[in-house]
């Protein structure tokens, strides 16, 4: 056995084994800046009302100045991507919708687009189904941004804004419940189309919302935009320029607030977005204030898109015609919420043994997807949401991986917060709008 200041070495049956002795600790200490004696380490989270979920921030402070910040994630890991490998392709929609729980319809749409690309049926998706997807995603974008404005304002002291933001979001959730049967975790967008059609009463409620929301946005701006404390807490705080965003892969409102108009709905269109008229809001300051203005402007643009989508809705099927892929979507749920009348069952399952067998195999085993791999990216409220789906030719995914914007954007927090005040960590972190369900998944 030999020894050194750093490790001991010994021979074993498996080969050389080194044991670290820590003898170099004195060298580390001697090289430490004496000013570090005044620094303390503080844990913010994982149970903290201002970290947008179970996020842990490890802060090294010198007085009230943040010298070092580390994000610790993983507290909300649910193993969704792994679980999808044991479910058929349609059942995957019920898993992905639970990741970013504030933007479930984006998770579902990205997944459905990836599966449809593997199947080679992108051109078979009906116009009505595609329009409904755009309609639902833009309503979801509005509700997500409303939560951001509400929670960020609350964290910076404007509690009344939280009440107003959640009040308007409730209106959107009622629309979702009317269309999908659920307020959240819808599993509504599925490979081949959507689960069922949009009822007429939902269209009337959407038009009421389109009339209401612009007035509420004006109230938000009156409440916050000219408020001196809000301006002081957001302007020149959490600054990250376009170069920093690109270096770290940051996308979404954070990137657009730095002056780069990168929006996948414009640059790499999907779901027919190239046929809609809307603008991509940008700002130039790259601070919390700029991100606030960009998100409010995006709500206005989404309202335009929702109105165009509603006007475009034409009667027609909402699921592909191929019965080897399509789950029944032509019937609405009955007033009893069940829809299990004899007529309902007869239309779905048919009236022969062969039809029943086909329906049973489609639901339990699922359809087969040709072997291959694809990547599909869409513009979610927090940035680029990407799906890498791999098929080995079976009825279940070989691998499904999500490029989650919350996870990617969080790595920019140290660059935004280090050198600033601890109070500005709250504003900077909130401006990234992380949702830990999506980040940790």
Curated annotation (Swiss-Prot):
One GO CC annotation: plasma membrane
Keywords of this entry: Cell membrane, Membrane, NAD, Quinone, Translocase, Transport
EC identifiers of the protein: 7.1.1.-
GO molecular function, one term: quinone binding
Paired cysteines (S-S): none
Reaction(s) this enzyme catalyzes, per UniProt: a quinone + NADH + 5 H(+)(in) = a quinol + NAD(+) + 4 H(+)(out)
InterPro entries in alphabetical order: NADH_Q_OxRdtase_suD, NADH_UbQ_OxRdtase_49kDa_CS, NDH1_su_D/H, NiFe-Hase_large
NAD is among the record's keywords: yes
Topology in membrane: Peripheral membrane protein
Enzyme's top EC category: translocase
Residues passing through the membrane, by range: none
Annotated localization: Cell membrane
Chief localization: membrane
Cited Gene3D superfamilies: Cytochrome-c3 Hydrogenase, chain B
Recorded family membership: Belongs to the complex I 49 kDa subunit family.
Assembly and binders: NDH-1 is composed of 14 different subunits. Subunits NuoB, C, D, E, F, and G constitute the peripheral sector of the complex.
NCBIfam families: NuoD, PRK06075.1
Protein name, UniProt field: NADH-quinone oxidoreductase subunit D 1
Natural source organism: Salinispora tropica (strain ATCC BAA-916 / DSM 44818 / JCM 13857 / NBRC 105044 / CNB-440)
Organism lineage: Bacteria, Bacillati, Actinomycetota, Actinomycetes, Micromonosporales
């Amino acid at each position: 056995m030999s020894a050194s200041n750093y490790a001991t070495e010994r021979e074993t049956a498996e080969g050389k084994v080194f044991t670290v002795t820590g003898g170099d600790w004195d060298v580390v200490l001697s090289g430490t800046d004496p000013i570090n004696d005044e620094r303390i380490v503080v844990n913010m989270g994982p149970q903290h009302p201002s970290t947008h979920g179970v996020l842990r921030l490890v802060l090294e402070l010198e007085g009230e100045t943040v010298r070092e910040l580390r994000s610790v994630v993983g507290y909300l890991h649910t193993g969704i991507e792994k679980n999808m490998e044991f479910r058929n392709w349609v059942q995957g929609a019920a898993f992905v919708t639970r990741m970013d729980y504030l933007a479930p319809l984006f998770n579902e749409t990205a997944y459905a687009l990836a599966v449809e690309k593997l199947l080679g049926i992108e051109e078979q998706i009906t116009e009505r189904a595609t329009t409904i997807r755009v309609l639902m995603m833009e309503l979801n974008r509005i509700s997500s941004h409303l939560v951001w404005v509400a929670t960020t304002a609350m964290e910076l002291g404007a509690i009344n804004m939280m009440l107003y933001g959640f009040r308007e979001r409730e209106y959107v959730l009622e629309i979702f419940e009317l269309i999908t049967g659920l307020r959240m975790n819808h599993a509504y967008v599925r490979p081949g189309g959507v689960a069922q059609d949009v009822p007429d009463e939902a269209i009337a409620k959407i038009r009421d919302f389109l009339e209401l929301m612009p007035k509420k946005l004006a109230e938000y701006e009156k409440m916050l935009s000219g408020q001196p404390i809000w301006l002081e807490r957001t302007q020149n705080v959490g600054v990250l320029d376009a170069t920093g965003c690109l270096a770290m892969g940051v996308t979404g409102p954070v990137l657009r607030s730095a002056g780069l108009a990168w929006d996948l709905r414009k640059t790499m269109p999907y779901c027919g977005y190239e046929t809609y008229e809307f603008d991509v809001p940008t700002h130039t300051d790259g601070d919390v204030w700029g991100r606030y203005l960009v998100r409010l402007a995006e709500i206005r643009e989404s309202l335009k898109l929702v109105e165009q989508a509603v006007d475009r809705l034409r009667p027609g099927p909402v699921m592909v015609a191929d019965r080897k892929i399509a789950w029944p979507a032509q019937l609405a749920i009955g007033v009893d919420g069940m829809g299990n009348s004899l007529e309902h069952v007869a239309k779905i399952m048919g009236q022969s043994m062969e039809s029943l067998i086909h329906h049973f195999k489609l639901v339990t085993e699922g359809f087969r997807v040709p072997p291959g791999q694809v990547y599909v990216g869409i513009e979610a409220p927090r940035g680029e949401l990407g799906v890498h789906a791999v098929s080995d030719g079976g009825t279940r995914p070989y691998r499904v991986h999500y490029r989650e914007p919350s996870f990617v954007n969080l790595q920019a927090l140290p660059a935004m917060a280090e050198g600033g005040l601890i109070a500005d960590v709250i504003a900077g972190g909130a401006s990234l709008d992380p949702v830990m369900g999506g980040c940790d998944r």
